[in-house]
Amino acid sequence: MTSLGARRTTDARAAYSALDNALVCPAGLLQLPFYERDAPLYLQYGALGTLLAHEMTHAIDTPGRRYDADGRWRTVRPATRHASTAARLDGLARSYEAWRALLAEGDSATYARNMRLPGLLTYTHEQLFFLAYGALWAHQAPPQRVHSNPLQDKP
């Protein structure tokens, strides 16, 4: 486990620090493709929201639940509660639920932050949410890596 002091502000990777009981969101993460201040909310929740929600689940996963609020090593929750809580806090589901709840409020500011983008008018807001989520994990692999690694089932 690393503490907050071991991270650089220019990192573009969120993390949960069990030692500090804190979510680390370095400044390097608050830029494209993860965040854009004026981007529609479906893109922000689909990308950065999902990433941060995922990292928050580490507070209750197997290693994370062994630290208390002061960073001391001990089991603070019974395993049965841990399993049910972890299932409910899945990053993608939590971010999607939060975004949908925000939309349900229906004020004009929320509506304005969910306008469709030019060139993407054929997609629904829900589709764009999941496209933003998928874009987080997309990358271009060199051909030799694609051919040397057969497709595998990974959770």
Descriptions of predicted regions:
Residues 1-49, 56-155:
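Zinc-dependent metallohydrolase catalytic domains
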